[in-house]
C-alpha cells in the first residue's frame, strides 16, 4: 500500500501516521528523515542538499524531489509500500511526485487527509501558557490551572504566552498552510485518491475511520 497523509498542524497527523505504519506495515517516510539519511549516506542528492544547508540556504525543489525519488527507489518500498509524510508541500512538488512515481512504476493508492476546522486548531495550538517563575506549562483547554491565573506548582500569578503560541501568529501559520495545501488536495481529489477523515472526533474514532477507508 502506497499512501500520502495530509492535514494542518495540530490536526493529529503524527498520531495517525504512527497507527498506519504499525497497522499496515508500510515504511514511514518523512522529509526530515529522508534528508538526514541522504546526507549521512552521502548520496548524490544528499551531498547537494548539504551544500545548501551548510550555507544557510533553502534547499531547492529539484534537490528535495531528487531525495524523495532516491528513497522511493529503494527495495524496502517495493516490498512493503510507504506512507509519505510532509511531502509534497507545494503543487509543483505534487506534479514532480506524479512523474517520479510513474517513472518508478509505483501506484499511489490513497491520500489520507485529516480535516479539522482551522478555528479549532487555533484553540488547540494557541492555548499554551508558561509560568515565568518556575517554568510549569499549562494549556487553557487540555491542562488548565486549578485556579485561573495562578500556577499550581509555585502559586505565581506571572503566566505568559510565547510569541509563536499567540492566536494571531498561529492563525497566520495555518493560513499559509491552507493556501499551500489547497491546490494539492484539489489535484489528488481530481485523481480520485483523497480520503477525507473527520479529525475533530476522539483519536480512536479517527483511527477507526482510517481503517474503514483503507480496509
From Swiss-Prot:
Subcellular location field: Cytoplasm
Gene name, Swiss-Prot/TrEMBL: adk
UniProt region (LID), positions on chain: 127-165
Protein keywords: ATP-binding, Cytoplasm, Kinase, Metal-binding, Nucleotide biosynthesis, Nucleotide-binding, Transferase, Zinc
Family to which this protein belongs: Belongs to the adenylate kinase family.
Subunit structure: Monomer.
Pathway: Purine metabolism; AMP biosynthesis via salvage pathway; AMP from ADP: step 1/1
GO (cellular component) term, any one: cytoplasm
UniProt name for this protein: Adenylate kinase
PROSITE patterns named in the record: ADENYLATE_KINASE
Enzyme Commission designation: 2.7.4.3
Reaction it catalyzes: AMP + ATP = 2 ADP
Sequence positions that bind AMP: 31, 36, 57-59, 86-89, 93, 162, 173
Main location: cytoplasm
Manganese found in the keyword field: no
Pfam family, one: ADK_lid
Function text: Catalyzes the reversible transfer of the terminal phosphate group between ATP and AMP. Plays an important role in cellular energy homeostasis and in adenine nucleotide metabolism.
Sites where the protein binds Zn(2+): 131, 134, 151, 154
Lineage: superkingdom: Bacteria
Amino acid at each position: 500500500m502506497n499512501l500520502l497523509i495530509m492535514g494542518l498542524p495540530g490536526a493529529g497527523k503524527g498520531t495517525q501516521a504512527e497507527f498506519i505504519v504499525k497497522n499496515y506495515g508500510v515504511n514511514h517516510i518523512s522529509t526530515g528523515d529522508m534528508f538526514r539519511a541522504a546526507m549521512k549516506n552521502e548520496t548524490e542528492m544528499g551531498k547537494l542538499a548539504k551544500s545548501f544547508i551548510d550555507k544557510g540556504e533553502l534547499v531547492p525543489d529539484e534537490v528535495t524531489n531528487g531525495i524523495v525519488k532516491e528513497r522511493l527507489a529503494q527495495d524496502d518500498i517495493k516490498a512493503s509500500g510507504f506512507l509519505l509524510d510532509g511531502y509534497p508541500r507545494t503543487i509543483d512538488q505534487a506534479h514532480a511526485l506524479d512523474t517520479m512515481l510513474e517513472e518508478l512504476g509505483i501506484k499511489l493508492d490513497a491520500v489520507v487527509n485529516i480535516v479539522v476546522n482551522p478555528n479549532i486548531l487555533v484553540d488547540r495550538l494557541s492555548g499554551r501558557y508558561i509560568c515565568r517563575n518556575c517554568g510549569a506549562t499549562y494549556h487553557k483547554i487540555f491542562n488548565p490551572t486549578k485556579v485561573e491565573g495562578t500556577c499550581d506548582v509555585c502559586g505565581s500569578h506571572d503566566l505568559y504566552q510565547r510569541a509563536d503560541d499567540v492566536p494571531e501568529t498561529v492563525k497566520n501559520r495555518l493560513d499559509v498552510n491552507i493556501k499551500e495545501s489547497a491546490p494539492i488536495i484539489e489535484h489528488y481529489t481530481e485523481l480520485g485518491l483523497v480520503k477525507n477523515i473527520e479529525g475533530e472526533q476522539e483519536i480512536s474514532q479517527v483511527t477507526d475511520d482510517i481503517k474503514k477507508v483503507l480496509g
